[in-house]
Structures are given as structure tokens and as C-alpha cells.
Amino acid sequence: MAGKVRSLLPPLLLAAAGLAGLLLLCVPTRDVREPPALKYGIVLDAGSSHTSMFIYKWPADKENDTGIVGQHSSCDVPGGGISSYADNPSGASQSLVGCLEQALQDVPKERHAGTPLYLGATAGMRLLNLTNPEASTSVLMAVTHTLTQYPFDFRGARILSGQEEGVFGWVTANYLLENFIKYGWVGRWFRPRKGTLGAMDLGGASTQITFETTSPAEDRASEVQLHLYGQHYRVYTHSFLCYGRDQVLQRLLASALQTHGFHPCWPRGFSTQVLLGDVYQSPCTMAQRPQNFNSSARVSLSGSSDPHLCRDLVSGLFSFSSCPFSRCSFNGVFQPPVAGNFVAFSAFFYTVDFLRTSMGLPVATLQQLEAAAVNVCNQTWAQLQARVPGQRARLADYCAGAMFVQQLLSRGYGFDERAFGGVIFQKKAADTAVGWALGYMLNLTNLIPADPPGLRKGTDFSSWVVLLLLFASALLAALVLLLRQVHSAKLPSTI
């Protein structure tokens, strides 16, 4: 009898396994998307005062044809901007090597060949291109030669227009503040039901204002049409060359030399030797350049801590005398009325942060911002050093910077108290620097082919539960049959 039981057991188990296998093969499957691989992109932001490298990453499959991009890492290039190497183009290229070596480590090796690498130069190179196009070309050729030596997919080095710089800064700000697309708690991307913010960027050589508008564009050059994340946007943008912080300081310095013989925006007790060649070498100060001046001559200049004269000096930077349109900002440039909330970054942030944090002054309203600027301009050099130790390098220029920001926002762009209440001053958002570079990469990802998503065969949860129950039933049935056979074998045989 035991032999009979042993002979029945394998067929029973085999039948159960076969039945389970047949059921498994009959269950319909569907394609389930695997987590997408990451792609990387590198942007070198070649500004007027310095160069920064940003490495971005995004899923290889994209959301509505624009990559979901986040900052992976960054690196500040030592030295000045590449435009400062006009007499030594190879120095511009060599300055980038340290950050490029870091990029080799930050981007996975297997992704090097597919990682696009871009260099975008802004107002510093725009100015150099105006005064010395040959030198500008030589600098771009030198950095191009170095960038092509690395295993990345180099896509070019070029000078961005002021319009591009403004628009890409606007894209960055709104992306980081989740106005285009947001990751919800349900684990899906969705478009939030809120408007966009305007963006104001104050660089070293230019300043940009960009915002979405429904007003008709009287100057077509100031209107840009964008398509991001399946949505269409019409924005106003304008870039003012020579109105960046560094160039404004140079222009004020040139005016002070010509008009006063002292600098009303510098603190009393501060003096320095000014090299005339440094003051007048920029095209921004060319109109103020005296005839037959000695570029190697040095002039001693002292500060006077005079906020009223400083305000007059800053006001001279703006012209409101003529406007060929229904309304203008300044210098005859068309601008619709500012609308909605704004984010102000770069030197806007650093200036206001100095007033708010270092000086402890309120800046929540335009009136408070003006009072804070006057407060700083009233300080002597000794008082400023005692109040803000450790910032000697730029300390003497904060009065002029604060006056300029206040005048630019109130008189230049036309912010009143109500509109100014909607302006936030911000350096970073979501651990990512606010600037044009991320917006540039977001725009360029429309041109980068998406990898097809990886697929694997998967089973619905409900089907999986049914299979589990069937397997368990088959095994239980086999066990019951086995026990019955064993029990039958133990009973006494009848004759």
C-alpha cells in the first residue's frame, strides 16, 4: 500500500504544478514603466564678473516635451569673467579647467558622451563684442577649444542676447517656484492653478525685467512667445545694457570725477587712488570720457556721505524726457504696466539683503527702501566698518547700489507701494540658484531627444491576488489528497 501512495504522490503534485502554470500563462499582462534613467546637462554661465558652472539632471523620459530638470551640482570658476581675458584668451579657457574636471566626477562616466555642454556669455561679452569684436571672437574660440577636449557633447559657446537672458531668468524663477508644474502628493506631476511671477535680474553689466502680460506689445522686439510644459506664454522682456551693478558704479564714478571732484555716494573718511584707464575703458563710460585723458594717470578721490547729492547722481542715469510709445520705463523704452508678483535676484538680492541683514534696516516698502538707502549713505567709513566688519571690499559701494536699486524700481520700472509689496528678493529656490542658466537648460531640453521609457512585463495587483489564491488552493488540495492516501494506507485490509 505504501508503494501505491508513493506512486500517486508525484502525479498529484505534478498536476497541481501544471495547473498553476497553465493559469499563470493565461493571466493577461501589461507593460509597466520602469523608473527612467537620468540625463545630465552642463551650462557654463559666463557672466561679466565671474563664470559659474551648473550641472542639471532630469528623467530621460520627459513631461510634455520639456525635461523635469533639477540642479545636480555647481562650481564657481576662479578669477574674473571671460571678457576680462580680452588680452589673454588662453587664460579664459584655462580658468575653466578646474570646474570641468569636477564635472567629470559629478556626471556618471557612462553618461559623459550623452551629456550636452553649453557655454552662454552675457553682458560682459556683449560689451566686449561692441568695443573689440576680434578679441571677443578670440576668447570664444579659446574656450571652445578647451571645452571640446572633454568627453561631453559640446553644443557651442555663444553670446546670449539681453532678451534671451531676461526670458531664461523668468523661466528659471517660475520653474523653481512651481508655477509651471508641480509634483503632487499622489506621486504625479500636475499644473498648478496659479499665475506666473515677473523676474528682475541685476547683473554686473546689465539688468533685465520680464513678466507675463496681456497688454498689446507696441514694440515687437520686447515680446516673446514661449511654449513650456504644454502651455503657451506671452511675456514682455527688456534688457538694459550698462545698467548692471558694476557698470553703474563705473558710470557714477566717472560722473563724480567730472562733476564734483569727490564722490557723494562714498562714505566720508574713505578715499582711494582711481586709475583713469579703468574708469573709461568701458563703452558704458565712453560718452563721459574727457578728451586727451591719460589712461595711466591716477586721481585721488574721497567720499562725502551725502545722500542727497548721491540721489541726484543716480537720477542722472535715467532719462524720462521722451517716449515714442503710449508709456515707457526710461530711455524711451516701451514697457506695459508692471502686473502681478515679482522675484528679484542676483545683485537685487545682495543689495537688499545687505540692508536687511547686515544693517538691520526694514525694506518692506518703497519708503522704507529709500530710508534705508539714505541711512547707509549717511554713514561714515568708520561707522560702516564698525557696523559691518569683514566686508571691506564692497562696503563703500553699498550706498550707490541701494540708491540705484530704489531709483530703478520706483522711477525706472514704475513700481508703486502696492506693486512693490508683491516683490520678493531671493537668491535660491529649491536649493537651486535663481538665474538664466536653468531656464536655458529647460529650453534646450526641448531639443534633446527623450529616451524611450524602459518597459517590463507586470501583473495587476488584483490578478496577482487571484493567482496567489489559486496556487494556495492547488497546494491545499494536493495536501488533502496526500493525507487521505496516507490515512487509507493505515487502515486494516479486509479479506
UniProtKB/Swiss-Prot annotation:
Its EC number(s): 3.6.1.-
Superkingdom, taxonomy of origin: Eukaryota
One of the protein's GO biological processes: platelet activation
Tissue expression as described in the entry: Brain, placenta, skeletal muscle, kidney, pancreas, heart, ovary, testis, colon, small intestine, prostate and pancreas. No expression in adult thymus, spleen, lung, liver and peripheral blood leukocytes.
Effect listed in the UniProt record for changing N443D: 7% of wild-type ATPase activity, accumulates intracellularly
GO molecular function terms listed in the Swiss-Prot or TrEMBL record: ATP binding; GDP phosphatase activity; ribonucleoside triphosphate phosphatase activity; UDP phosphatase activity
InterPro entries membership: GDA1_CD39_NTPase
Binding site for ATP: G204, A205, S206, T207, Q208
Glycosylation sites: N64, N129, N294, N378, N443
Extracellular topological intervals: 29-462
GO cellular component, one term: plasma membrane
Keyword Repeat: no
Record keywords, A-Z: ATP-binding, Calcium, Cell membrane, Disulfide bond, Endoplasmic reticulum, Glycoprotein, Hydrolase, Magnesium, Membrane, Nucleotide-binding, Transmembrane, Transmembrane helix
Annotated transmembrane regions: 8-28, 463-483
Entry-linked PROSITE patterns: GDA1_CD39_NTPASE
Cysteine pairs bridged by disulfides in the record: C75-C99, C242-C284, C265-C310, C323-C328, C377-C399
UniProt-annotated catalytic positions: E165
Resulting phenotype, C399S: Abolishes ecto-ATPase activity, accumulates intracellularly
Keyword Nucleotide-binding: yes
Family to which this protein belongs: Belongs to the GDA1/CD39 NTPase family.
PANTHER family tied to this protein: ADENOSINE/GUANOSINE DIPHOSPHATASE, ECTONUCLEOSIDE TRIPHOSPHATE DIPHOSPHOHYDROLASE 2
Function: In the nervous system, could hydrolyze ATP and other nucleotides to regulate purinergic neurotransmission. Hydrolyzes ADP only to a marginal extent. The order of activity with different substrates is ATP > GTP > CTP = ITP > UTP >> ADP = UDP.
Protein name: Ectonucleoside triphosphate diphosphohydrolase 2
Record organism: Homo sapiens (Human)
